Amino acid sequence: MLNSGSLIWLRIDYMALTMMGKKRGMIQLFDEKGNAIVCTVIQAEPNVITQIKTKETDGYTALQLGFEKVTGKTQHTIEARTGKPRLGHFKKAGVESRRFLVESRLDSTEEYTLGQEISVDTFNGIEFVDATAISKGKGYQGVMKRHNFAGGPASHGSGHHRHAGSTGMRSTPGRGLPGGKKAGQMGNERVTVQNLRIVKVDSENHVIVVKGQVPGPRNGLVYITQAKKLAKKKS
């Protein structure tokens, strides 16, 4: 259990299905009180079941989902873009080639079959979700942008306006300790945002609208799963 301000965060021990979708952009909506809320639109075309794992054959129970068909002008192009190992995998499942795969551990897979499509209706009745994506790459950045350092003096004549400052000590230990905050590659890493409230599930257009920001650029791949923590107000 984690305490944070006036909320108590409870870790939920369960296994939930993970779907894949594409971030289509951000919009502004109004809640029932007339307050403007910033939302992210995620379009999740039906994910297809490409493999069902069981304890007898694999040692654990899980579902593997595929997302976004591999496209090409000819069948040869599609097969070349898929690769022979995956071609055999999809052929065994009886589904068309998919670009992305994700596996979700579940307590039971009895209600699922190979080739079955999983739609956004899965999230009907769910209030919060977690979203995982690759964040936007910012390239090589300094410590002020990357780590929010204050920087040096801004006055004229100072030679270290945006420098990091001291990075170590003297003869003891005589080296810079590893793990220090320095300039370097920023972004382009796997980021998870937890407890995004679902504002709307549009089954007809395969869209989920969540309150808040989701990592990554427009049209970036997003993994969506039921929230692993639930927030409850302190009694």
From Swiss-Prot:
Annotated spans, Disordered: 150-189
Single biological process term from Gene Ontology: translation
Keyword Ribosomal protein attached: yes
Record-linked SUPFAM superfamilies: Translation proteins
Transmembrane segments: none
InterPro entries the UniProt entry points to: Ribosomal_uL3, Ribosomal_uL3_bac/org-type, Ribosomal_uL3_CS, Transl_B-barrel_sf
Keywords: Ribonucleoprotein, Ribosomal protein, RNA-binding, rRNA-binding
GO MF entries: rRNA binding; structural constituent of ribosome
Domain of life: Bacteria
Keyword Ribosomal protein: yes
GO CC list: cytosolic large ribosomal subunit
Purpose: One of the primary rRNA binding proteins, it binds directly near the 3'-end of the 23S rRNA, where it nucleates assembly of the 50S subunit.
Assigned protein family: Belongs to the universal ribosomal protein uL3 family.
Subunit (UniProt): Part of the 50S ribosomal subunit. Forms a cluster with proteins L14 and L19.
Name used for this protein in its record: Large ribosomal subunit protein uL3
Organism encoding this protein: Protochlamydia amoebophila (strain UWE25)
